[in-house]
Design a protein with these regions (language model features):
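His/Asp/Glu-enriched short active-site or ligand-binding loop at hydrolase and phosphoryl-transfer sites
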Residues: 127, 137-175, 203-214
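Structural recognition of the beta-strand scaffold that forms the well-ordered cores
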Residues: 39-43, 64-68, 90-93, 129-133, ...
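Secretory targeting and sorting signals
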Residues: 1-21
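CE4/NodB-like, metal-dependent polysaccharide N-deacetylase domain
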Residues: 56-58, 62-63, 90, 106-139, ...
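C-terminal domain-boundary segment and adjacent tail
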Residues: 22-35, 59-60, 74, 188-218
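Extracytoplasmic/secreted proteins, especially bacterial periplasmic and envelope-associated proteins
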Residues: 38, 52, 78, 108-111, ...
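Active-site beta->alpha N-cap acidic-glycine motif
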Residues: 22-100, 119
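Acidic-and-aromatic substrate-binding clefts and catalytic sites of carbohydrate-active enzymes
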Residues: 46-49, 68-77, 100-106, 132-138, ...
């Protein structure tokens, strides 16, 4: 696929030195600089297709970025196409198999990032431009691979609202925060808690990509 391109880019960056290696690579974003009273809701993976969470997203018209694994989306694509078509959802890249990308060679990174992009494009008719690296694991080699696959920004998160065992403490959200959720059995409750936290802070959910553009990050 793009292994040769990755190798050429890697050699060029190495010759330019470590400082130059960061020039032109997609940014890693865990919070969006903005003066607007907004937060960004993101949901990962896609294994649990919760109808109650879908109802909340659709009824409240919540802008949301879905960082999907192609396999998780493939057995019920209609669940996600409804969120896109009737709601305010966009589908983004979360790799094929959810590996720690920093542990893979160039070919492995290419297969995971480009491969997921191609599969999601085939399923939803749009090539994702944002990547959430699994576990938030990222380095310049991951950014280089992402760039070769057409990724404009790597998006991590400010706060994880997912209930992993016990309900986590609810932080006070600030403008530009990125909220992480997962398609788990607790998604509906986690989503409502995040929306309540945003409302308590005087913030509204907003679409991520337009604000990344406004901030000059993509």
């Amino acid at each position: 696929m793009l292994v040769a391109a990755l190798a050429s880019l890697s050699l060029a960056l190495g010759a330019a030195g470590s400082a130059q290696a960061r020039v032109g690579l997609p940014p890693v974003v865990n919070r969006v600089p903005t003066q607007e009273k907004v937060v960004f809701i993101t949901i990962d993976d896609g294994w649990n297709h919760d109808p109650e969470a879908a109802r909340i997203l659709l009824e409240k018209r919540v802008p949301v970025s879905l960082f999907l694994l192609p396999g998780a989306a493939s057995y019920d694509t209609e669940y996600f196409t409804r969120l896109i078509g009737e709601g305010r959802a966009s589908v983004e890249n979360h790799t094929v198999n959810h590996p720690d990308l920093t542990t893979l060679d160039a070919a492995g990174k290419d297969a995971e990032v480009c491969g997921a992009g191609e599969q999601l494009q085939a399923a939803f008719g749009r090539t994702p431009k944002l990547l959430r690296p699994p576990y938030g694991a990222v380095n310049d080699e991951v950014r280089l691979a992402a760039k070769a696959c057409g990724v404009k920004a790597l998006v991590t998160w400010t706060y994880d609202f997912t209930t992993w065992g016990e309900t986590p403490p609810t932080p006070r959200l600030r403008s530009g925060d990125i909220v992480l959720l997962h398609f788990t059995p607790t998604l509906a409750a986690d989503l409502q808690r995040a929306l309540d936290a945003a409302k308590a802070a005087g913030l509204k959910p907003a679409a991520l990509m337009p604000h990344l553009k406004t901030a000059g990050l993509v």
